[in-house]
Amino acid sequence: METFNHIDIKKYTREDLLYLRNTNNVLFKMFQKQVDEIACLSSKEQKLCGTLTSINNIINENYTIYCLIHTDGLIGFIKIGEKNLYLYDKIKLHYGKCTCVLDFYILEKFQKRGLGIKIFNFMLKDNDISAFCLCYDNPSYKLQNFLKKYFSPCVLIKQPNHFVIFSNYFKNVSIKKVYERISN
């Protein structure tokens, strides 16, 4: 098994990307191209027609992207952001602003080397949040297995909106973030 030294994790917010675009457009375009390439692979893995991630999407929607960077360039990312979602807990319908994992992909050559959990834990720590408090946008089979492997025991609950939550999501999310509404 090949070891990969010199792997960094970098966080880019909307403000970071706007600053990069305004101060070093050449570097911005190169980064944009790398994100687009990995986003295409992520979409292909999920059997989607279009891509979920682009620099413009991150800027326009005020999302955050965490990037795994190797000496050769970008090798993977996690995109997170807040979304207003309706979620069911089998009894009640909840509505609120939820922190979501919107896209997660690592180049195949770099998978199964502990880099996924490394970037995932970095993102969790940076946001002071638990994996059980996140919503996952239409996670691929690989992402579901990743969650089961590292956050076991877990039961993932599919929502009608294609998001997935952990079965104990409502026990972990503060009432300030999710408001209850009686479902009819």
Curated annotation (Swiss-Prot):
Gene3D superfamilies: 3.40.630.30. Keywords: Acyltransferase, Transferase. The record marks 46 as: Crucial for catalytic activity. The keyword Methyltransferase does not apply. One of its GO terms (molecular function) is tubulin N-acetyltransferase activity. Pfam families: Acetyltransf_16. Residues 1-170 form the N-acetyltransferase domain. InterPro entries: Acyl_CoA_acyltransferase, Atat, GNAT_ATAT. GO terms for biological process: regulation of microtubule cytoskeleton organization. The keyword Acyltransferase applies. Acetyl-CoA binds at residues 104-117, 140-149. Its EC number is 2.3.1.108. It catalyses: L-lysyl-[alpha-tubulin] + acetyl-CoA = N(6)-acetyl-L-lysyl-[alpha-tubulin] + CoA + H(+). GO terms for cellular component: microtubule. PROSITE patterns: GNAT_ATAT. Specifically acetylates 'Lys-40' in alpha-tubulin on the lumenal side of microtubules. Promotes microtubule destabilization and accelerates microtubule dynamics; this activity may be independent of acetylation activity. Acetylates alpha-tubulin with a slow enzymatic rate, due to a catalytic site that is not optimized for acetyl transfer. Enters the microtubule through each end and diffuses quickly throughout the lumen of microtubules. Belongs to the acetyltransferase ATAT1 family. HAMAP family: mec17. This is Alpha-tubulin N-acetyltransferase. It comes from Plasmodium falciparum (isolate 3D7).
